From Swiss-Prot:
Cellular compartments per GO CC: cytoplasm
Presence of the UniProt keyword DNA-binding in the record: no
HAMAP family: GlcN6P_deamin
Gene name tied to this protein: nagB
Stated name of the protein: Glucosamine-6-phosphate deaminase
Site (Part of the allosteric site): 151, 158, 160-161, 254
Length: 270
């Protein structure tokens, strides 16, 4: 596992965006051989999406031959609802780049048969072989996508009941009214995520510090979903300084030294 400890949330957004662009460009995708990118929603990746849009407009990257799969979607709200993840993705990213509509994949939270919808999504991912890079965020309790604490570490795309903690955290998007937050969501599973060639998790803020400590210094534990990254051959956590506050000083120092060249190169370009 790699940890890229940066100064602030803005740096996390810029570094992760440039990393994605470097991966896409190195892959040199074509219509027959597209780059498969997994994407999250939430407040943490907004800075990444903003930088990706800027890099696209500057001619640094094209998404014409990129296929995206989003992590999750609420059950029971329409796609055009202002808090649906369909709406979020189009408003904050997809409508501002050159990705073809047919290359965009999001779960349908209003499907009449959610089990069939989840299997369709799994099958669609498998039809491309694997996701090359899956970017995600992490919840205060260590959840990735909507894989809440105690989720099976081999789980596949499915419907999940959202915890009170998650619904409370997300209520800020629903007029601070938890009763407006859906109780269920469709989500890729931990096993689905682990099938990706590479996983990059973004974490910003002191409220994510305990989850980052569990991911890096703790044991693999289904109560901390993020700890599954320890079992992945190519996982990376990109975080700001506040998110490292629960880590041992020597742990942070170790990763600063390990990634010194990369962090230094980034700082020189700011």
């Amino acid at each position: 596992m790699r940890l890229i400890p940066l100064a602030n949330a803005s740096d996390v957004g810029k570094w992760s965006a440039h990393y994605i662009v470097s991966k896409i460009n190195a892959f040199n995708p074509t219509a027959e051989h597209p780059f498969i990118l997994g994407l999250p929603t939430g407040s943490t990746p907004l800075a990444t999406y903003k930088e990706l849009i800027a890099l696209h407009k500057a001619g640094k990257v094209s998404f014409k031959y990129v296929v995206t799969f989003n992590m999750d979607e609420y059950v029971g709200i329409t796609e055009n609802h202002p808090q649906s993840y369909h709406h979020f993705m189009h408003q904050n990213f997809l409508d501002h780049i050159d990705i073809p509509k047919e290359n965009i994949n999001l779960l349908n939270g209003n499907a009449s048969d959610v089990e069939t919808e989840c299997q369709r999504y799994e099958d669609k991912i498998k039809s491309y072989g694997q996701i090359h890079l899956f970017m995600g965020g992490v919840g205060n309790d260590g959840h990735i996508a909507f894989n809440e604490p105690a989720s099976s570490l081999t789980s596949r795309t499915r419907i999940k009941t959202l915890t009170v903690e998650t619904r409370t955290a997300n209520s800020r998007f629903f007029d601070n009214d938890i009763n407006q937050v859906p109780k269920y969501a469709l989500t890729v599973g931990v096993g689905t995520l682990m099938d990706a060639e590479e996983i990059m998790i973004l974490a910003t803020g002191l409220n994510k510090a305990q989850a980052i400590q569990a991911a890096i210094e703790g044991n693999v534990n289904h109560m901390w979903t993020i700890s599954c990254l320890q079992m992945h051959p190519k996982s990376i956590i990109v975080c700001d300084e506040p998110a490292t506050m629960e880590l041992k000083v020597k742990t942070v120092k170790y990763f600063h030294q390990l990634e010194a060249d990369i962090i230094g190169e980034f700082a020189s370009k700011k």
